[in-house]
């Protein structure tokens, strides 16, 4: 039986939390094509639906991809445009991991027609559903807030030098949301000095933040990148670690509450 493309729990607040990289499902026949290095799916945003599960009780809509980012990357521009010029990002269908290991066995790398097929089968339906949720929330409230949630290992030399701060908030340099929304998010995330915070630093926002964040139309988007060491053991990322996750969840609760309660100022 084919897995659905997303887990979707609809809420009644203006907030939508999108988690595009936590999926681990592979379509039939895909696993056999992967290299030994790629089969553990090392670039997965592990356990983010668990980390944010509380948000549904605050009225947030929660949408999370079920399929691995190695099938297709839902936070990449399908036309190949990069939102991080000069950074060696993986593409719509990656052929190497963040550690430069080959994802596919020899002779199994997808060709252009296979990449286009994945775009049509997986990328487009997922974004159609996400756009529908944003439109529904906007129609109900007059504005919508998208939190595009991600996580990553603390050190990924391919993407950045040194250790990434614990929490990285991106607003496309202020273009994807109202300034007061970004400030509300900063205040919520900065309340606990345990976790270091960066705002529009190395992480500014990927495809979803750039595409859906149109504040002049009442559509606001933020990208949050969480260092995985803040909520799990990076040596064993497949294991959920409640002892590490719970303190971070307290910070994320403040963030979710701030985004749910935020309202644009009347013109």
Roles of regions detected by a PLM:
Residues 1-146, 151-267:
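N-terminal catalytic or cofactor-binding beta/alpha core of small enzyme domains
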């Amino acid at each position: 039986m084919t897995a659905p493309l997303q887990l979707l729990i609809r809420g009644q607040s203006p907030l939508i939390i999108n988690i595009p990289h936590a999926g681990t499902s592979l379509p039939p026949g895909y696993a056999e094509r992967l290299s030994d290095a790629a089969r553990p799916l090392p670039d997965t945003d592990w356990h983010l639906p668990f980390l944010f599960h509380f948000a549904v009780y605050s009225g947030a809509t929660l949408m999370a991809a079920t399929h691995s980012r190695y099938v297709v990357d839902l936070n990449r521009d399908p036309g190949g445009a990069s939102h991080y010029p000069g950074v060696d990002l993986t593409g719509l269908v990656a052929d190497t991991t963040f550690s430069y290991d080959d994802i596919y066995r020899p002779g199994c790398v997808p060709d252009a027609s296979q990449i286009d097929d994945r775009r049509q089968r997986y990328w487009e339906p997922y974004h159609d559903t996400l756009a529908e949720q944003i439109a529904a929330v906007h129609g109900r409230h007059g504005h919508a807030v998208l939190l595009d949630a991600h996580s990553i290992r603390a050190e990924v030399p391919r993407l950045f030098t040194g250790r990434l701060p614990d929490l990285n908030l991106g607003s496309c340099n202020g273009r994807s949301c109202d300034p007061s929304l970004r400030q509300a998010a900063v205040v919520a995330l900065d309340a606990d000095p345990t976790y270091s915070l960066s705002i529009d630093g190395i992480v500014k926002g990927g495809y979803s933040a750039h595409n859906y964040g149109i504040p002049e139309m009442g559509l606001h988007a933020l990208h949050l990148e969480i260092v995985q060491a803040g909520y799990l053991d990076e040596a064993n990322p497949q294991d959920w670690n409640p002892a590490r996750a719970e303190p971070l969840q307290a910070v994320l609760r403040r963030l979710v509450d701030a985004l749910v309660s935020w309202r644009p100022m009347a013109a």
